[in-house]
Amino acid sequence: MLEAVEIIEVSPRDGIQNEKKLLSLDSKLELIDRAVKAGASRIEVTSFVNPKKVPQMAQADEICAALPRDTNCQYIGLALNRRGFERACNAGLDEVNFVAVASDTFCQKNQGMDTDSGLKLFNDCLLYTSPSPRD
């Protein structure tokens, strides 16, 4: 029997990444604020990707710098490569998520590498991380 279910709000990242009209920084922060006020305890706020490929994620660093820290909410960023991982680690987030892709074709299209390279990168980044919590 399942003892608990954890819901992660992903609309500030996944919900807007394919939108044609670019959202302002204020609009993105308002979306996050509304999720916090609605009771979300974990929010994937952005993705640290190339803004030329995903223009909606161009303000990842600015979003993280403006997040309210007086909440019980955990903020999460998505990283697809080492540069994104390093940016996410420096952004003051509570957590960095990775994507593990089963298909080489999709992994190449989404992350610019094959699945084995993606898993190796994930492992390398795990070795880099520290178990100490954010101050």
Give the residues covered by each predicted segment:
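Active-site mouth loops of central-metabolism enzymes
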Residues: P12-S27, Y75-N81, K109-G112
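Alpha/beta enzyme core
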Residues: K28-R42, N90-F98, R134
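Active-site beta-loop-alpha junctions enriched in small/polar residues
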Residues: R13, F48, L78-R83, V101, ...
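Conserved small/polar residues in nucleotide/adenosyl-binding loops
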Residues: Y128-D135
